Amino acid sequence: MSKTLFDKIWEKHVITGEIGEAQLIYVDLHLVHEVTSPQPFDGLRSTNRRVRRPDLTFATMDHNVPTKDIFNVQDQMSRLQMDTLVKNTKEFDIPLASIGDDKQGIVHVVGPERGLTQPAKVIVCGDSHTATHGAFGAIAFGIGTSEVEHVLATQTIWQVKPKTMGIKVTGKLPKNTYAKDIIMGIIAKYGVSFGVGYAIEFYGETVENLSMEARMTMCNMSIEAGSRTGMVQPDQTTFDYIEGREQAPKDFESAKNYWSQFYTDDESDFDETLTFDVSNLKPMVTWGTNPGMATPVDQSLPAIKDDNDANAYEYIGLHPNMKPVDINLDYIFIGSCTNSRYEDLEIAANMMKGHHLAPNVTAWVVPGSRAIRNRAIKSGIAQIFEEAGCEWREPGCSACLAMNPDKIPAGKHVASTSNRNFIGRQGAGSRTHLASPAMVAAAGIAGHFVDITTDEFV
């Protein structure tokens, strides 16, 4: 019987339970950060339990980290959460990449970077964008606080198996369009809830030609499509990325042979299929207050269809028939678990090289990990950003969410490489416009969005 990639991995991990009901599945990797872990560790203490597999658990600090001065944590709650993670990981013998550590960074960046993220695994974390790790051909999803405690105690989790959806991506990406534009285009076309109840697999020649960094960007935003899980079949690109990393399997050839068994046998095995052609795709920009409210950079903003649109326009300070190029910007943010990897920074730096920020723009560039930061400094990329007038920061989640000092002021427009543009997401009253690293970098130079596919940029 032919099966999907998701089905094959799921079946390998089921311990007990019937299809259609909650099943107990084994967890291969549990990633932990400072925000969603304090209560679970307290729960373990209250029942005198230990962490079942500390060797399959890894913790880092990211959400609360002040990226301008990582050791100067002013917020009392942030400091408490960070100190508590140090205490808990020490008590329960869990590896921790604390602030200042060479391995520290955003959890969904350092997991793959260290080689912890591998094909055919079940990976969980108390964070919705855990779907990022599915780019390696893994089942990866975010879990709630009580589930974090359950995984710590048992290395298992109860889950109802979702249906499967295949999204076939076809065509050749035009110049200066990227994976961020693909996933934003898919969400703009199909909406923010089409993936509810499904595990999404991205496939097709376009996906096969993407780098691992680009695949991670697409899987990262599966959650913005309503799914908890996005994934890509493992292939030679996957294997090349993992090989030689710190936590890569010692017998790599055997591991690669095992991973190669995991693929979708036939398109007809999916419960649902969609297609998306990128041949004429333009860079995407969000204009509203959810990721589905996005438009190609060269098109006018849409007419108001309902109260949601009207409210979004009022909040964001725009109106129909404007174009993204008419949006004047106050801030740009290059970072987050969506687009803070070396490749993302390199793309943005190439766009900024030899230019300077517009006078009205403040720019924060936040690498996803200490390793990426060090590499960017060594290669000269960091210098390009600094010469352009950007603030070159320490690794952390930063302005993706208003949980640390990196907040966008009320009423200000920010072009952001992050994944969510909800009301107040980047600071109370902030106005977020999502786009690719290349688009955000170019917007910082111009002071507004520009079409980077035109002759001037191509």
UniProtKB/Swiss-Prot annotation:
The keyword Metal-binding applies. One of its GO terms (biological process) is L-leucine biosynthetic process. It is an enzyme of class 4 (lyase). CDD domains: IPMI. It catalyses: (2R,3S)-3-isopropylmalate = (2S)-2-isopropylmalate. Signal peptide: none annotated. GO terms for molecular function: 3-isopropylmalate dehydratase activity; 4 iron, 4 sulfur cluster binding; metal ion binding. Keywords: 4Fe-4S, Amino-acid biosynthesis, Branched-chain amino acid biosynthesis, Iron, Iron-sulfur, Leucine biosynthesis, Lyase, Metal-binding. Its cofactor is [4Fe-4S] cluster. InterPro entries: 3-IsopropMal_deHydase_lsu (IPR004430), Acnase/IPM_dHydase_lsu_aba_1/3 (IPR015931), Acoase/IPM_deHydtase_lsu_aba (IPR001030), Aconitase_4Fe-4S_BS (IPR018136), Aconitase_4Fe-4S_dom (IPR036008), IPM_dehydratase_rel_enz (IPR050067), IPMI_cat (IPR033941). Binds 1 [4Fe-4S] cluster per subunit. SUPFAM superfamilies: Aconitase iron-sulfur domain. It comes from the Bacteria. Pathway: Amino-acid biosynthesis; L-leucine biosynthesis; L-leucine from 3-methyl-2-oxobutanoate: step 2/4. Transmembrane segments: none annotated. PROSITE patterns: ACONITASE_1 (PS00450), ACONITASE_2 (PS01244). Heterodimer of LeuC and LeuD. Belongs to the aconitase/IPM isomerase family. LeuC type 1 subfamily. Catalyzes the isomerization between 2-isopropylmalate and 3-isopropylmalate, via the formation of 2-isopropylmaleate. HAMAP family: LeuC_type1 (MF_01026). This is 3-isopropylmalate dehydratase large subunit. It comes from Leuconostoc mesenteroides subsp. mesenteroides (strain ATCC 8293 / DSM 20343 / BCRC 11652 / CCM 1803 / JCM 6124 / NCDO 523 / NBRC 100496 / NCIMB 8023 / NCTC 12954 / NRRL B-1118 / 37Y).
